[in-house]
């Protein structure tokens, strides 16, 4: 199987939500460096649900294999990604193995946790998320419509990948605006609102319990650039399995990343 790393850099903004930009001369709004290839990004959205104190602290990462080829030097930790990779189009079978990081004691061996087969087409983009928990992992494959939005606009997609959260609404507020605007409502676990257009800006975003004003989590200064495509998703546990022991990064939070980014300068 032939594969190549894709030059398009998905700008991951998963933990701190501070945007890492490309060089200002690199106009990432133009796709096509890997013509006639299918492009796939893997995102680890799978927290550790262990209830035993020692096990609850462990960060258990995942190795993705593509048609039996594994070319990541390190496993992908929650809630990170390995970026888009380019492959010959056709049938893609992805296998996923857990791999415990060096922080774990004992480190343990890798173990298969799942497999996913889907068809790919040339010049199309796909996202694969591991969801659920490390103890019961599921996989979601999404087709990524990375066509450019209307000039001056941006596109966003919204997902609920928090395994224990009830249905959620997503609201945004720009600048000093006093009234939040609902972008998605009643998103159940694994629910997706596919790409749609919004105005670019610097937003406060918040997930609320569906149909209420109860805010589960909010993030400020979320940068949405024009002519770009973003995914926004709920992650982690609303109620951590082992209070006081569960690794802090597994608590409910908001992630977003740019599937396609255009330099606004």
Residue ranges and their predicted role:
Residues 10-11, 265:
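Generic low-complexity segments that are intrinsically disordered, proline-rich and/or Lys/Arg-biased
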Residues 22-265:
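Intrinsically disordered, low-complexity polar regions and short flexible loop motifs
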Residues 1-10:
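Bacterial N-terminal signal peptides that target proteins for export
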Residues 17-21:
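C-terminal motif of bacterial Sec signal peptides marking the signal peptidase cleavage site
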